[in-house]
């Protein structure tokens, strides 16, 4: 599912923002969440993604045994806005989009029977990628930690910031997560993927539509 900060609904072609494949070694289907995507599940499968400056929240209900993952970054129009933004600026375009990305994941989990008071969260990403918006990773980390605190969501583990991109695998039933540092050879591909996503957000948010939070 793709987060749409302008029209505030899922794009018609949801499958374009995650891919499904069978991992023979693990004997499970795996779903790769792409930038801007959200995926939730109550099935025996693994959710995975690659993260540079973007962040992912992995959230699950250990009683209902449902969980999900998002993959997003905050949209900034220019370096000045990025540099001077802070997480307590709740009405800024960046904060509203970040909140929308989180609420989309939470609401999808609640629709599967999860209870908000039982939810647990693990956070990943926000690396400082050389040559790509020097502060964007830091701002993404600041936002997601502030959001969790403000919403009273329990963060049981996190691996945020630093210089190295990450690969994440997440079991939506148990909340178990695996992390692997991405080799240098893969960094350019991931950077290009995130830059395309960032440019798409810039074009969309320039249209000036309001984001409705729920």
Swiss-Prot record:
GO molecular function, one term: protein-glutamine glutaminase activity
Gene3D superfamilies assigned: 3.30.1330.200
Family matches, as InterPro entries: CheD-like_sf, Chemorcpt_Glu_NH3ase_CheD, Cytotoxic_necrot_fac-like_cat
Catalytic activity: L-glutaminyl-[protein] + H2O = L-glutamyl-[protein] + NH4(+)
Membrane-spanning residues: none
Keyword set, alphabetical order: Chemotaxis, Hydrolase
SUPFAM superfamilies, sorted: CNF1/YfiH-like putative cysteine hydrolases
Catalytic activity, EC: 3.5.1.44
A Pfam entry, by short name: CheD
Biological processes, Gene Ontology terms: chemotaxis
Annotated function: Probably deamidates glutamine residues to glutamate on methyl-accepting chemotaxis receptors (MCPs), playing an important role in chemotaxis.
Record family assignment: Belongs to the CheD family.
PANTHER family, sorted: CHEMORECEPTOR GLUTAMINE DEAMIDASE CHED-RELATED
Protein name per UniProt: Probable chemoreceptor glutamine deamidase CheD
Protein species of origin: Vibrio vulnificus (strain YJ016)
Gene this protein is translated from: cheD
